A protein has these predicted regions:
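Single conserved hydrophobic/aromatic residue that forms the stacking wall/gate
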Residues: 1-11
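Short, structured coil segments at secondary-structure junctions
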Residues: 6, 27, 115-116, 159
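NAD(P)H dinucleotide-binding glycine-rich loop of Rossmann-like/cofactor-binding domains
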Residues: 9-79
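Glycine-rich NAD(P) Rossmann-fold beta1-alpha1 loop
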Residues: 50-51, 79-86, 146
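Adenosine-nucleotide cofactor-binding segment
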Residues: 77, 93-152
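Surface-exposed amphipathic alpha-helices with a cationic face
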Residues: 85-94
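Glycine-rich phosphate-binding loop and adjacent beta-alpha segment
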Residues: 148-173
Length: 173
């Protein structure tokens, strides 16, 4: 492709270092031009959160393929009103999973349902000391929060389930 340099031409790719560089030399085949209907900021917000969400969703889909006929159905998404979480809810819903979204924002329940969450749970149900053993509820989990919320999601994941961890905004414990 023919790439120009200058204001308004912002290109992105998530494979190489140098995202904060003012100038970087990279192979032109690795570049994607920012769509004209998005600002540079919007493009990067979607690019970073969207890429992370997509990788987490693909991990769940790949696990399903390994189960040889066992269907991954119930998927939990923590931090569901954040960038990665909300995009994960949308992607997983489009993939056909029953998504349960976890949020601490009660005023966002309608929003989460509008983007594909079948159920919405308050994070208070997860932000507590986990039991050593709990009932298996989830075939898959996308966790963007970490800490006690992740610990509870782990003990509630069914045997042969998959957990994709891509954040620790709550705690690194």
């Amino acid at each position: 492709p023919d790439w120009s340099r200058g204001l308004g031409d912002v290109y992105k790719r998530q494979i190489y270092y140098g995202g904060y560089s003012q100038i970087a030399k990279v192979n032109g085949d690795f570049l994607i031009k920012t769509p004209e209907n998005l600002t540079n900021k919007q493009s990067m917000m979607l690019g970073t959160a969207g890429f992370t969400s997509l990788m987490a969703s693909f991990a769940i889909q790949a696990r399903e393929a390994l189960l040889l006929g066992e269907r991954v159905k119930d998927v939990l998404v923590t931090g569901a009103t954040g960038g990665v979480g909300s995009i994960a809810v949308m992607i997983l819903n489009k993939m056909g999973y029953d998504v349960t979204a976890v949020t601490g924002k009660d005023n966002q329940i309608d929003f989460l349902k509008s983007i594909g969450a079948k159920n919405v749970m308050n994070r208070g149900e997860f932000d507590k000391e986990p039991k050593l053993i709990d009932k298996g509820l989830w075939d898959g989990v996308v966790d963007t929060v970490g800490g006690k919320i992740l610990a509870n999601a782990i003990v509630q994941t069914k045997p042969n389930g998959i957990i994709s961890v891509c954040g620790n905004t709550s705690s690194n414990e």
